[in-house]
Amino acid sequence: MFVLEQEDQELYDRIQEQNLNRQYELLTNCIEIGLKKGSVAFDKYMLWALNHVAVANISQFGGRFRVEPIYVGDHKPPHFKDVADWMDRYISTIQENWYIWSPTELAAYGLWRLNWIHPFIEGNGRTARATCYYLLCVRSGALLPGRKIVPERIREDRVGYENGLKAADQAWEDGHLDITKMEDYLAALLQAQLEDDGLPYQGG
């Protein structure tokens, strides 16, 4: 069962917003587990679950890696036959650098690289933003306070987000890893979240 955006925009938008709320509830559970288990809790099964809930009833291929080509503007993600290998590398890189990189470095890498691989048919951005926040919280050792969390702030500041992705893409194209621009962008959003008065985020 699924709804096409072209068939009923209002229903599609409502389902998508409800999915984001459900994804946040799942994400908080994942963060709690991550705080107990550390780097080993970060695995493909968590990513599958976060993607599945993000696209429930708007895509029939949620929660599984793509097995077909996908195109994103000027970016051409890896061939679908290579997705599983790239995702193994992605997860290993995060686990191996868990105590080396800062929370914002881990989150910047997690956000950029998942978008670069684009492992899912739908919901890659939503899954990447949730992953980014998971890494920020777990690596920082707490479910971070603030009534407007980083993923929501990213949605509101697309220019900085896209500039960070493009800068990291270009660096990788040139033969090196440089996520500095994305890290600076996330650090500013995180600071704004932590300084935001009010109750902790409740979804929405």
Which residues make up each language-model segment?
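FIC/Doc superfamily catalytic core
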Residues: 1-204
